[in-house]
Amino acid sequence: MNAKEKIEELLEASEDGTITAAQVTEAGLHRSVLQEFVKSGEMYRFGRGLYVRSSAWEDDFYLLQRKYGRGIYSHDTALYLLGYSDRTPAKYTMTFPKGYNAPSLKQENLIIKRVVPENYEFGRIEIESPSGNPIRVYDLERTLCDILRGSGSDIQTVSYTHLRAHETEA
């Protein structure tokens, strides 16, 4: 099996059209093979070590979380993903544990929140992105608390969201 066939096999196994440089190395291939795929237009580089098949449906929520594995969608982005807001956020909000530092985070179109490591996992759930891929997000209760605790929150929006959530549960 040649390098191209191995890459194709890895992409087929991934189901989402993504592949990492680490997977290529584990398969016994040199990472330069990925650059050949990028040059030919069959793939593009989404971030450091993360490559996506050009024909794959691009899911920003999923790809950003693959790129920043410690990030959890929170605040207004979580409200949107949980179905309690009809406004697509202009910038996605992700929460990271304090001490996590990825220099490229500042270059993304993200609002970055930090939390002490003891509270980082609290309220974390896994849901499907709008494109059907698994993503991590904070649950509704954690999201509402985070929004209320933050500065400049719109109390009417949060109250409306909370009431709407309880109406759907009843």
Mark where each language-model region is.
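Glycine-centered, phosphate/nucleic-acid-interacting loop/turn motifs that mediate DNA/RNA or nucleotide
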Residues: G41
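Nucleic-acid-binding surface
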Residues: T18-Q23, F46, L50-Q156
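A small-molecule sensor/coupling module
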Residues: S159
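Short amphipathic alpha-helical interface segments
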Residues: N2-G17
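Single conserved hydrophobic/aromatic residue that forms the stacking wall/gate
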Residues: H162-A170
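Short amphipathic alpha-helical interaction segments
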Residues: L29-E36
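Alpha-helical residues within the helix-turn-helix
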Residues: E26
